[in-house]
């Protein structure tokens, strides 16, 4: 059974589940296996790309906030399948499943959702090298943020705050 570590979010002081000890023990979210509506939980997948100690974020025109690229897991999809689809739609990137490496699972209030919904997100790391994704669909912009730059934003989405805490704990940002 995988162990769960806790980390304190320096922005709120609250504790949250930061990551599982091994991605090999991880069972990906699959929407067909859970009654998400009953639990008011939204299954999602997010992409983590770190370059020069900065995290790639995508600006959602719909929600007016910076997020991890990715999105909702549709019925019958695994988290990786959903992420590949979303990344193609949002960033014009054609990634292979082998490029995605499970990093962490986060759970946080889904920003801008009414009524309140919890987001459950499997996050996968990927290396792009010098390739810069292009914003498409509902994405208005993509850019890399250092932790200090992210902290200066007027809106800090809770899930992204958790990811930064994990990356900081691992010395990646």
Language model features by range: what are they?
Residues 4-18:
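Positively charged N-terminal leader segments that act as targeting/secretion signals
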Residues 20-46:
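Acidic, metal-coordinating catalytic segment for phosphate/diphosphate chemistry
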Residues 49, 123-127, 144-146:
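Short, well-ordered beta-strand micro-motif
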Residues 50-90, 94:
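Conserved Nudix-box catalytic region and its N-terminal flanking loop in Nudix hydrolases
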Residues 61-65, 137-173:
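Nudix hydrolase/Nudix homology domain
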Residues 94-104:
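A short coil-to-beta-strand element that immediately follows conserved catalytic motifs
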């Amino acid at each position: 059974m995988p162990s769960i570590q806790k980390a304190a979010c320096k922005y709120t002081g609250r504790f949250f589940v930061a990551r599982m000890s091994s991605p090999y023990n991880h069972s990906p979210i699959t929407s067909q296996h859970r009654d998400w509506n009953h639990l008011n939980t939204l299954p999602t997948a997010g992409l983590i790309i770190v370059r020069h100690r900065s995290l790639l974020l995508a600006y959602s025109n719909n929600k007016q906030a910076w997020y991890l690229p990715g999105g909702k897991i549709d019925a019958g999809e695994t988290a990786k399948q959903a992420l590949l689809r979303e990344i193609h739609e949002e960033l014009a990137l054609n990634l292979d499943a082998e490029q995605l490496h499970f990093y962490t699972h986060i759970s946080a209030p889904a920003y801008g959702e009414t009524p309140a919904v919890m987001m459950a997100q499997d996050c996968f790391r990927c290396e792009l090298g010098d390739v810069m994704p292009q914003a498409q669909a509902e994405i208005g912009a993509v850019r890399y943020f250092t932790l200090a730059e992210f902290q200066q934003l007027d809106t800090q989405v809770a899930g992204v705050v958790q990811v930064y805490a994990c990356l900081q704990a691992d010395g990646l940002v």
